[in-house]
Amino acid sequence: METQHSRFLQYITHGSLVKQILLGLAAGIILASLSTQAALAAGLLGTLFVGALKAVAPILVLMLVMASVANHQQGQKTNIRPILFLYLIGTFSAALIAVVLSVLFPSTLALNAQAADITPPSGIVEVLKGLLMSVVANPIHALLNANYIGILVWAVGLGLAFRHGSASTKNLISDASHAVTAIVRVVIRFAPLGIFGLVASTLAETGFGALWGYAHLLMVLIGGMLLVALVINPLIVYWKIRSNPYPLVLRCLRESGVTAFFTRSSAANIPVNMELCRKLNLNEDSYSVAIPLGATINMAGAAITITVLALAAVHTLGIEVDIATALLLSVVASICACGASGVAGGSLLLIPLACSMFGISNDIAMQVVAVGFIIGVLQDSAETALNSSTDVIFTAAVCQAEDAKLAEKERLNLL
């Protein structure tokens, strides 16, 4: 009996997390179909799990980045520039794909939904201003509000200052980052329970009946995200690593995308991505900065959402769109997507900004936003899964490419 108990504990603490998550997913679906009340009650597990991830993510980013910068050795590469370049290329490519799909399969909307009572940003300048104001945020305020741009700036600044500190100070910071990482691993082991609760409560609260009226729009949105995840991202990774990209892409989708799909929060998924980067044996100096940065500005899914819904409004109103305007929309959607994390309501509240390019009134644009909230149970989940998994994919691609270059140099030096 004791042996069976120890085996069960061993499976819970060291078993395959992906298999456990799939079990939690299946159990959540079964519970929601059997008892709505029990499923709603199980939602507490999901709320606690997402809350725990959101609680630990800001301090994890602060400590990891600060420790990484403070202990950085002179001449050691961090690879941030090439990773940032891939983030921007990926987001713009996603916006282009969304334009192409919207032209090939135009969606129309019944614009009679009640406008959401939220004020969207008035222009790109306001979005960029919000992003820049995040940089100069009070550090305590940044930690409390999970402002990752502000946290990154303070972490890098403190890390640079601590470079001049004593060895014991640097060791203390490094030990503190390891301690926070250990807490994160414990939280992540509760993912199966969290996803069980999230799935059960979501199905019990909404079901999927409300989504059938927007089936065509959802097919274009999710089809675009799948195309980016399974075709565009692998092409970008192949261009970088010059080998089969699918083992890396599929692993990131499985281990990062699945969790992000159910938590629906890029910030909450930062600890999951950090742990995956550690498992992939990537350079900590690179991923400790690139992952939280990606959670803020790498928004391929948001670019697709903004573009598809804006063009759905355009098609509904019978407005003609030429190639030049479509390209401009891709650029605008990419810039908006990069600022989506700094806007309450995320990508949906940036749709009026894209609609304004076509002279669409704010009243109609906010009705499009209301449609976005209706389909959000799937749209937001798929968007977050694409955004978050892409952070790891591009970070890993750059790190692996740099490792391959170093190995080649060493081989040539030995000849």
Curated annotation (Swiss-Prot):
Gene3D superfamilies: Sodium:dicarboxylate symporter (1.10.3860.10). Keywords: Amino-acid transport, Cell inner membrane, Cell membrane, Membrane, Symport, Transmembrane, Transmembrane helix, Transport. Its main location: membrane. It is a multi-pass membrane protein. The chain crosses the membrane at residues 21-41, 45-65, 83-103, 142-162, 193-213, 217-237, 299-319, 331-351, 358-378. InterPro entries: Na-dicarboxylate_symporter, Na:dicarbo_symporter_sf, Ser_Thr_transp_SstT. One of its GO terms (biological process) is threonine transport. The keyword Transport applies. One of its GO terms (molecular function) is neutral L-amino acid:sodium symporter activity. GO terms for cellular component: plasma membrane. It comes from the Bacteria. It catalyses: L-serine(in) + Na(+)(in) = L-serine(out) + Na(+)(out); L-threonine(in) + Na(+)(in) = L-threonine(out) + Na(+)(out). It is found in: Cell inner membrane. Involved in the import of serine and threonine into the cell, with the concomitant import of sodium (symport system). Belongs to the dicarboxylate/amino acid:cation symporter (DAACS) (TC 2.A.23) family. NCBIfam families: PRK13628.1. This is Serine/threonine transporter SstT. It comes from Pectobacterium carotovorum subsp. carotovorum (strain PC1).
